[in-house]
């Protein structure tokens, strides 16, 4: 089955999945995780020392990371995970300005690379963990007959929601896509720019815009929206999510334990449940 079809099927079944909560899979995998967690990442828990980790994470990771937080804290009672979500560019700026952070989980390699080149990341810890896709969405029941990214340049679209290209990775990818199609100059005159991808999603959910460009994973958890299509092949860079330890972290060992957990098969099952895939 083509990936676009997979996400369309997921979009139509998401309310059922939310009700069921992937119940049997969660029960079985969680039981396995709790049995084995002490052997895998027991250092911080064994010492009894309370640790709070601050993780700056892209807004598109909100739902899955909130689930991971609940489970990880239950298995590691002395560890508190404090997630701060936002646009990757804004989070990059926070780290550059000295905001306390232990890990950075970006929605693009650009921001991670910049911080690493500035000497603000532990280079050896950086992992390209996840891959996402960029999709065009419309409000559920839209009568605009929008069927492609090319349609955004036509009279079918009066306003489109996009991430701010200067700070929001999905906005950068959007600009790349429309530029590759030769219609960016027209599209940008119709654009309403959001501070992060979830803002764009909310605009489409409420019908404030005719369409929007978001990640497939955001569309998967969205309400009252329809996926039109994925970005044309080769129209933008591969959407990779890197994660790494901030060099100024005061809890490097605990951060390394959590980073190791994010790379386990159990954690990847969580990410895949929200539409992400492992980066290749």
Language-model region placement:
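Periplasmic-binding protein-like
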Residues: 101-106
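A short, gly/pro- and small-residue-rich
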Residues: 118-126
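Short, glycine-/small- and polar/acidic-enriched structural segments
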Residues: 126-134
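Conserved beta-strand core positions
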Residues: 53, 79-81, 134
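Short, low-complexity disordered leader/linker segments with a strong preference
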Residues: 1-52, 271, 275, 279-280
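Exported/periplasmic ABC-transporter solute-binding proteins
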Residues: 37-75, 89, 93-97, 108-109, ...
């Amino acid at each position: 089955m083509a990936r676009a079809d997979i996400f369309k099927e997921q979009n139509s079944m998401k309310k059922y999945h939310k009700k069921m909560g992937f119940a049997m899979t969660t029960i079985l995998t969680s039981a396995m995780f709790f049995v084995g967690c002490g052997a895998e990442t027991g250092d911080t828990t064994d010492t009894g020392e309370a640790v709070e980790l601050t993780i700056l994470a892209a807004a598109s990771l909100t739902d899955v990371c909130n689930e991971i937080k609940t489970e990880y804290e239950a298995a590691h009672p002395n560890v508190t995970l404090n997630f701060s979500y936002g646009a990757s560019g804004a989070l990059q700026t926070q780290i550059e300005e000295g905001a306390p952070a232990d890990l950075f989980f970006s929605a693009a390699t650009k921001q991670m690379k910049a911080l690493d080149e500035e000497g603000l990341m532990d280079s050896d810890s950086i992992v390209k963990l996840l891959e996402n896709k960029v999709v065009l969405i419309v409000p559920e029941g839209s009568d605009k007959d929008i069927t492609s990214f090319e349609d955004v340049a036509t009279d079918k679209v009066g306003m489109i929601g996009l991430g701010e290209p200067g700070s929001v990775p999905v906005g950068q990818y959007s600009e790349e896509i429309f530029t590759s199609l030769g219609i960016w100059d027209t599209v940008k005159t119709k654009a309403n720019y959001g501070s992060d991808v979830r803002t764009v999603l909310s605009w489409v959910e409420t019908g404030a815009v005719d369409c929007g460009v978001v990640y497939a994973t955001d569309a998967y958890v969205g309400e009252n929206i329809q996926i039109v299509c994925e970005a044309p092949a080769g129209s933008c860079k591969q959407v990779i999510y890197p994660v790494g330890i901030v060099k100024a972290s005061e809890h490097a060992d605990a951060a390394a334990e959590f980073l190791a957990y994010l790379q386990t098969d159990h954690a990847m099952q969580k990410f895949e449940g929200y539409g992400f895939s492992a980066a290749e």
